[in-house]
Structure formats: C-alpha cells, structure tokens
C-alpha cells in the first residue's frame, strides 16, 4: 500500500495515519499543544530542516488540523494555530505520552514530562473509557466490526 493511498482506506487508523503518520508531524502537534505557533520556534525546538517543517505544516493546514494566520506585515509572517480538529487530537497525544512513559521511560537523568491537573497540581493518568458506560476500553472487552 502506498502512503498516498492511506486516506482512501476503510480503516480509520490508516486514514488518521495519512494525516499524522510520521515523527515530525507528531512532534509539531506536541509543540502546538505546548503553545508553539511560529515557524522559527518549531525549527529551533525540533532541529528540523526548513523544507521538512514547511511540508509538515502545509499538510496539517491542508488537513484542517492547523490554521495559518498572519501575525506580521512586511514581510508577512504566519503562525500556526490548532483548529477544532487539531484540538480533538489531544486525547491521542495524551494517551501516546502515557504509553511512551510506560514502555520507553526516561533515562533517569532527565525528569520525565508528566501531565498534572491545572486545578489541583496532582498527576493525571489518562484512561480511555466508553462514553456511555464510563468503563475502561480494553482489548478484552471491545472488538472492531463493520
């Protein structure tokens, strides 16, 4: 299967991967949720080439995940903001963070990045639950079907 063909697949995972399916795109989105909006800031934080960054930002704008808005005239410069579609990616990113912390923990020298509640300051542990029942969703209690 070719990369460009993923968006036409019946599988929602394949279609999602057609939008966010590489490391740079995921890291750009991570930084967006941390408040990064400007091209130079993304480039500095990620160490990514201008060409690759421009490509990933364009794809995210084209997919409706980010919007491109001018913040300066002469020369015109743009910043990138999460759209409603982009903000809907947050639970995926949070779950990926939790998985990464469990499976690929920090080296012990650098403190790990943790999610904490803005209200209490306490650590937050994400759990994927069924909206109707509030029960955790696990491989043993759900299946995919058409």
Where are these regions (language model features)?
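Basic, amphipathic "hinge/linker" alpha-helix immediately C-terminal to the N-terminal HTH DNA-binding motif
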Residues: 21, 72-93
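Extended, folded domain segments that form the structural surfaces/walls around functional sites
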Residues: 29, 37-42, 57, 92, ...
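Canonical helix-turn-helix DNA-binding module
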Residues: 39, 43-71, 75
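Alpha-helical linker/hinge and terminal dimerization helices associated
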Residues: 16, 26, 63, 92-104
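C-terminal regulatory/oligomerization modules of transcriptional regulators
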Residues: 94, 98-146
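A detector for short, charged/polar N-terminal pre-domain segments
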Residues: 1-8
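N-terminal helix-turn-helix DNA-binding core of bacterial DNA-binding proteins
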Residues: 11-49
């Amino acid at each position: 299967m070719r990369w460009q063909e993923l968006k036409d697949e019946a599988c929602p995972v394949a279609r999602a991967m057609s939008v966010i399916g590489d490391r740079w795109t995921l890291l750009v989105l991570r930084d967006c949720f941390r408040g990064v909006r400007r091209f130079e800031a993304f480039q500095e934080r990620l160490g990514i080439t201008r060409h690759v960054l421009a490509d990933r930002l364009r794809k995210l704008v084209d997919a409706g995940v980010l919007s491109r808005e001018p913040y300066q005239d002469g020369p015109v410069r743009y910043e990138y903001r999460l759209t409603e579609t982009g903000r809907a990616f947050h639970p995926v990113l949070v779950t990926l963070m939790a998985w990464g912390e469990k499976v690929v923990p920090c080296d012990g020298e650098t403190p790990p990045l943790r999610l904490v509640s803005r209200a209490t300051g306490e650590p937050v542990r994400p759990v994927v639950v069924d909206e109707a029942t509030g029960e955790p969703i696990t491989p043993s209690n759900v299946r995919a079907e058409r």
